[in-house]
Amino acid sequence: MKYTILSLILIQFFASRAQAPKYSNEFLHLGVGAQAFAMGNAVAASSEDVTAGYWNPAGLTSATEWLQVSAMHSEYFAGIAKYDYVGVSHSLGKKGVLGFTFLRFGVDDIPNTTQLIDNDGRINYDNVTTFTAGDYAFMGSYAKSLAIPGLSLGGTVKVIHRRVGDFAKSWGFGLDAGVKYRLNSHWKFGLVARDATSTFNAWIFNLSQDMQQVFLSTGNEIPTNGLELSLPRFITGISYNHSIGNPDKGFNIAAELDIDATTDGMRNTLIKSNTFSLDPHMGVQLSFKELVKVRGGVSSIQQFKAIDGSSSWGVQPNLGLGVGIKGFNLDYAFTRLGAAEAGYYTHVFSLKFKLSQPKKK
């Protein structure tokens, strides 16, 4: 059954390219870091480490170490799809902070059964080959604190490469921008403009004559070269932080509420219209001495219709833990990908460590 599903991906993918896309480059919105996953991805205002290069580049100004490195691996749909992330940040002192983010979401060893039946009408399994469908993103970020205390700005340049075997490939380009303001030791605010100028992907298709014939015989349109656009998405976040006792020796609780505003029409969110949709999500973290952290969050507030025509609301719960020792952090999240009632649970682990500048001899 697993490989039957995989064999359908090729034709389904090309058929979707022949239509006006609504959800373009969605792999860029999955998120990074088990900490964020556990908090329902509500970190636009509180992200202050290397992962801020993805969530809100303005938050990189708090990554004051010479070098921070983070990595994550997760698998979806019973291991069919694999999602990987690597991030690096480097402090330039008063000149700001640089960041680099790499993302890959891919499905490997997909059976290509378009030539399963030969010219004589017989099934020939020797004609079945495999291919990989992979999405890649290379993101460079820069952030700097401004003269106004607590205010910082950041930006990210994104280069996107998507490939489906030897049949199709695309290159894309986009920009993200972020601002962050720390009011005091308790309150922080964040604003992010994803795909601020609209992100584009230029697709090029390379289908053999035999494959084109398969598309026509199965009632599918033959895709043509073209552009795919990702419209801007705006994320606002407000975070509250409170320490119980000495901040370095006691407990600390932090909570954040984010609202994602999409501009590509009606989506299945809490608040929606024909032009935009609003998707709130929130998270909370309880930590002790920065050593142990317990996290929880709620996201994907969506409406579902039953077979009898009735409808109900569902949410996606998220849980996680974190452990930190001397600049090394291990985070875990139990979350799921997809609709709140139909998604697949997955375990997400991420690592992060900090390095000081080597001393000159």
Predicted regions and their residues:
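Subset of outer-membrane beta-barrel
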Residues: 19-361
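Bacterial Sec-dependent N-terminal signal peptides
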Residues: 1-22, 284
